[in-house]
């Protein structure tokens, strides 16, 4: 009896070492016990500490077991290059088609870009190829065909975009020419003044009669040439330049031609081009009549070229304008076009000597 009583307290102490009561364990804790911190089945308290701290496992394990773990971890390291080498070996090499196979495939592609399976198998057997090789070749060939089509379409689209720009530049030039007729004539006076003037011959103190007669004939011919040249210059200036039209005329008293600047208007006016051309024609006719009636013989007799003075540099003389063209005047707007209007471009004037 005493022996039994002596054994019982030892048994009670062993049972008391468990911290949890089996009657209080829940069903969910039994299933998901490894996710909770609570010990569901009454394991020793040192069990959770061993799982949380892995270094304690090595302390309790034998040295032989630790050595086996290190060996197994070292054996796992060289296993990765083996997998990489296997992957490199599994990489498919590019198929090298022969010239005969390429010709047959190209002919088939021209006839039909898309193949159904029976036709693909037939071509593969005939060319000693796999069905997959024929399928991939047709896919690549279709992609190349689409790229070629897109490459041809891009230059056409660029050319279409360039055409409107050229048309716009042409329209701008037309608009500038039309706007030039309504601009202020004062803007063009500066350009007319910058034109080089004709040089006047120096006066010879000993006049020569033969030289004076020769100069008279040259002056008479120059008057006709200058008038026609001035008229063509005016028409060209109206059609091409963007500034207001200006007229240059020649004076017969000095035997040379000078430029005459037009009077500027007070503001911007828009006139009809035909009216402007008609006013130019009338002013030129009036100036031609005045030139024919002028007596330039006494003046020309006193002017001649001297042989010793040919090396001298001629001087430029700005003569006063011989006529006044009403470019911006309201009177030019009220003039009416005559029925028998002659084209000033082809009109020629013959002046008497």
From Swiss-Prot:
The terms under GO molecular function for this entry are:
DNA-binding transcription factor activity, RNA polymerase II-specific; RNA polymerase II cis-regulatory region sequence-specific DNA binding; sequence-specific DNA binding
Q: Where is the composition biased (Basic and acidic residues)?
A: 148-157
Chain spans, region Disordered? 48-92, 148-170, 202-223, 242-267
GO CC, sorted alphabetically, is: nucleus
| Major location category of this protein | nucleus
Q: Compositional bias (Polar residues) at which positions?
A: 48-83, 210-223
Enumerate composition-biased segments (Low complexity): 248-267
Q: Which residues bind DNA?
A: 90-149
Record-level GO BP terms: amnioserosa formation; compound eye development; positive regulation of transcription by RNA polymerase II; regulation of transcription by RNA polymerase II
Q: Where in the cell is it found?
A: Nucleus
Q: Which UniProt keywords apply?
A: Developmental protein, DNA-binding, Homeobox, Nucleus, Transcription, Transcription regulation
Q: Quote the PANTHER family the UniProt record gives.
A: PANCREAS_DUODENUM HOMEOBOX PROTEIN 1, PROTEIN ZERKNUELLT 1-RELATED
- Describe the function of this protein: Required for the differentiation of the dorsal-ventral pattern, and does not appear to be involved in the process of segmentation.
Question: Could you identify this protein by its name?
Answer: Protein zerknuellt 1
Which source organism?
A: Drosophila melanogaster (Fruit fly)
